[in-house]
From Swiss-Prot:
Name of protein: Leucine--tRNA ligase
Major location (coarse): cytoplasm
GO cellular component: cytosol
EC number(s) stated in the UniProt entry for this protein: 6.1.1.4
NCBIfam families with a match to the protein in the record: leuS_bact
Any single Pfam family the record assigns to this protein: tRNA-synt_1g
GO biological process, one term: leucyl-tRNA aminoacylation
Length: 802
């Protein structure tokens, strides 16, 4: 008889909900364990089979830790602001708030149907004013610390849509919606000074138990470079510009300079004869994203301005070009070009036939740039020095002559924090008619997003909030001064930067989080989610956490102690699942046909948690068959416990059981769920062969499978005679001494060739081993003289006979 998953799963989900089985008390006697999932964006499409993979992993850990005596915090919530809801509202005329609420209800029901042990009393929703009150409060703190500021920044402007687009909304220079042209134009934006935390974000990575590959992605994104700033005067004018270089030792080899097309000096220094060409080039660049501009493989383009810079170290005049591979937002927006020793400069110089000058020996610059180390040449006071010594000496010279200085720079840019959208947290700032700007008072938070029918873009580049006159226009009650509210909203990243803190104290209206509770629960012990958030979300969350640490809100320097990226579940044909390919698997269908326990077991058994693996219906059926085997082993056709289950011990199963407890316990802790499940399958095979099943082993096995398949776990526990939930039963333990082999396999050789293998007591003496071996091969050595017998205790017997 197989089990009725629909009946059992409904029954236990109802039981858990009614009894609040997974409610986390704020007690401090037990050790704590905080298991966090990357909370989902509740899209209209609902949950897909990729979501439960990470959720099942944290759930297995949470369930095991509860049984091991930990107080477990395992929460769930919704990252619900963001573009898709706004786009849907624009397309249908419905409110994004209603759409979002509908989606959240769908997601919640789907997640509950999978049997995850979340404490639903701690649920958070980033679009709830009682939540985003504190997102706005954090913004005020950033503003007070000078970490939030306004700047003119080039953005992706789509005239047809009348709005600014994020990079991911643009495909081949056109808007994803409608395929309209997109151009770059400077606009007033809020920025967050994440660069002020660059060193700490870099250094503290060393203390984290994160995959090295992921730490490297963050290191590269932060991109710390040591070098020098060099000041260049522009010939015949009072103007000057600064470049940053990691190779100041090659300054004697500079043969031209390049400015970003948007650089403020370009208009001033371009000579009349070059004006037309320069303006045409600037216009052509407007359509390109930063990514397209800096693509290494692309053909180099540029235009000469007609102006010259003066090399401070030797007075040589260097032509000034503009080229799109130099970005105004990176470094100083200007570079000195040393084509003999830099690949990109070499390509550019080759394209435009610009001079090259060797200043480091070791390569052949007629063929390619030489970027290695070597003795300096053609470099006056640096001649003969290697790279390291030459850099130090050149920086000394720059500082003595005030032509430059030592400098550390970052690839990391400040975080562009404003969005010209309706569906986001309002930024709590007022711009006054006298040009000043103040933050909304703390006691006036939350600044609630006003309800409006009209969420069409304003067309001016401001967000749709600019259309709501009665909300935008304010008067200072004390001075009568008129002002306008900030109409930009925060990006979707904002709410997800700190949600792990709100789970700790979700209903606190007086503080973001209670200091005692946050001390108890931080840091998060394990954080599991997709690798697509490896850089931005994690970097932004770490940045906000460090700011909160500096102002005394949190007691730890880092939020997430251990991090793990799950792999992707692909379609059966190894392609990414997508609606357009028609290969999306809906978990609701699987829960109906096979059961939630089967889905959970299958996703954990597919392969290593971090691997991307193709979905397989056969694999799913196999997972269900295994659960049916477990059920049939323990439960008879009439629904009663199997008569094989007895209070008496069974020596034959002893080793297999203790081995299983050891392996499953270790593998769960190390997130090796597939091998833990394999071991449980081995045990079930052994148990089928056994005459009797000791009740202790059956109970231990049920406890081990319950974190993966909690509904069947609860039902079997109940049938074993327990009225309480299995959730807080104590985790099984193993006895090391029971794992030791009593018997060993001995290889028997004749003249070094294996003839047979024998099983004997591991304590057998040399004499016993020899006797048993000779007995086993007596036919093969008949008529031969045994010259010598070599015995290696516990391993082999080699007989020399001829």
């Amino acid at each position: 008889m197989s089990f009725n998953h629909q009946e059992i799963e409904k029954k236990w989900q109802g039981h858990w909900e009614e009894n609040k089985t997974f409610r986390t008390p704020d007690e401090t006697e037990k050790p704590k364990f905080y298991a966090l999932d990357m909370f989902p964006y509740p899209s209209g499409a609902g949950l897909h089979v990729g979501h439960p993979e990470g959720y099942t992993a944290t759930d297995i850990l949470s369930r095991m830790k509860r049984m091991q005596g930990y107080n477990v915090l395992h929460p769930m919530g919704w990252d619900a602001f963001g573009l898709p809801a706004e786009q849907y509202a624009l397309d249908t005329g419905n409110s994004p708030a209603e759409f979002t609420e509908l989606n959240i209800n769908t997601f919640r029901n789907q997640i509950k149907a999978l049997g995850f042990s979340y404490d639903w009393d701690r649920e958070v929703n980033t679009t709830d004013p009682t939540y985003y009150k504190w997102t706005q409060w954090i913004f005020l703190k950033l503003f007070e610390k000078g970490l939030a500021y306004v700047d003119e920044v080039p953005v992706n402007w789509c005239p047809a849509l009348g709005t600014v687009l994020a990079n991911e909304e643009i495909i081949d220079g056109k808007s994803e919606r409608g395929g309209h042209p997109v151009e770059r134009r400077p606009m007033r934006q809020w920025m967050l000074k994440i660069t002020a935390y660059g060193d700490r974000l870099l250094e503290d990575l060393d203390e984290l138990n994160w995959p090295e590959s992921l730490k490297d992605m963050q290191r590269n994104w932060i991109g710390r470079s040591e070098g020098a700033e060099v000041h260049f005067n522009i010939d015949g004018t009072d103007e000057k510009f600064t470049v940053f270089t990691t190779r100041p030792d090659t300054l004697f080899g500079a043969s031209y300079c390049v400015l970003a097309p948007e650089h403020a000096l370009v208009a001033n220094i371009t000579i009349p004869e070059q004006k037309e060409a320069v303006e045409a080039y600037i216009n052509s660049v407007k359509m390109k994203s930063d990514l397209e501009r800096t693509e290494l493989a692309k053909e180099k383009t540029g235009v000469f301005t007609g102006a010259y810079a003066v090399n401070p170290v030797n007075g040589e005049k260097l032509p000034i070009w503009i080229a799109d591979y130099v970005l105004a937002t990176y470094g100083t927006g200007a570079v000195m070009a040393v084509p003999a020793h830099d690949e990109r400069d070499y390509e550019f110089a080759s394209t435009f036939n610009l001079p090259m000058k060797e200043v480091v020996k070791g390569g052949d610059i007629s063929k390619e740039a030489y970027t290695g180390d070597g003795a300096h040449v053609n470099s006056a006071f640096l001649d003969g020095l290697n790279k390291e010594k030459a850099i130090v000496k050149m920086i000394e010279w720059l500082e003595v002559t005030s032509a430059g200085n030592q400098k550390v720079t970052y690839r990391l840019r400040d975080w562009l924090f404003s969005r010209q959208r309706y569906w986001g947290e309002p930024i709590p700032v007022i711009h006054w008619e006298d040009g000043t700007m103040t933050a909304v008072k703390e006691e006036e938070l939350p600044l609630v997003l006003p309800k409006t029918e009209n969420i069409r873009p304003s067309g001016t580049g401001e967000s749709p909030l600019a259309n709501i006159e009665e909300w935008v226009n304010v008067v200072d009650p004390e001075t009568g001064k008129k002002g306008r509210r900030e109409t930009n909203t925060m990006p979707q990243w904002a709410g997800s930067c700190w949600y792990y803190l709100r789970y700790i104290d979700p209903n606190n209206s007086e503080a973001l989080v209670d200091p005692e509770k946050v001390k108890q629960w931080l840091p998060v012990d394990i954080y599991i989610g997709g690798a697509e958030h490896a850089v931005l979300h994690l970097l932004y969350a770490r940045f906000w956490h460090k700011v909160l640490y500096d102002i005394g809100v949190v007691p730890t320097k880092e939020p997430f102690q251990q991090l793990f990226n799950q792999g992707m579940i692909l379609g059966e044909n190894n392609e990414k699942m997508s609606k357009s390919k028609g290969n999306v698997v809906n978990p609701d269908d699987i829960v109906a046909s096979h059961g939630a326990d089967t889905l959970r077991l299958y996703e954990m058994f597919m392969g290593p948690l971090d691997a991307s693996i193709a979905w397989s219906e056969n694999g799913l059926d196999g997972a269900r068959r295994f659960l049916d085997r477990v059920w049939r082993l323990f439960i008879q056709e009439n629904g009663e416990l199997s008569e094989k289950i007895t209070d008496a011990p069974n020596k034959d199963l002893e080793k297999a059981y203790h081995q299983t407890v050891k392996k499953v316990t270790e593998d769960y802790a190390e997130l090796r769920f597939n091998t833990a499940i394999s071991q449980m399958m081995v045990f079930i095979n052994d148990a089928y062969k056994a005459e009797t099943l000791p009740k202790e082993y059956v109970e231990g096995f049920v406890k081990m499978i319950a974190p993966v398949a909690p509904h069947i776990g609860e039902e079997l526990w109940n049938k074993l005679g327990y009225s309480e939930t299995i959730t807080y039963a104590s985790w099984p333990t193993f006895d090391e001494s029971k794992l030791v082999e009593d018997e060993v396999e001995i290889v028997v050789q004749i003249m070094g060739k294996v003839r047979t293998k024998l099983t004997m007591s591991k304590d057998a003496s040399k004499e016993e081993m020899e006797q048993l071996a000779l007995e086993a091969i007596k036919e093969q050595i008949e008529g031969k003289t045994v010259r010598k017998v070599i015995v290696v205790p516990g391993k082999l017997v080699n007989v020399v006979a001829n």
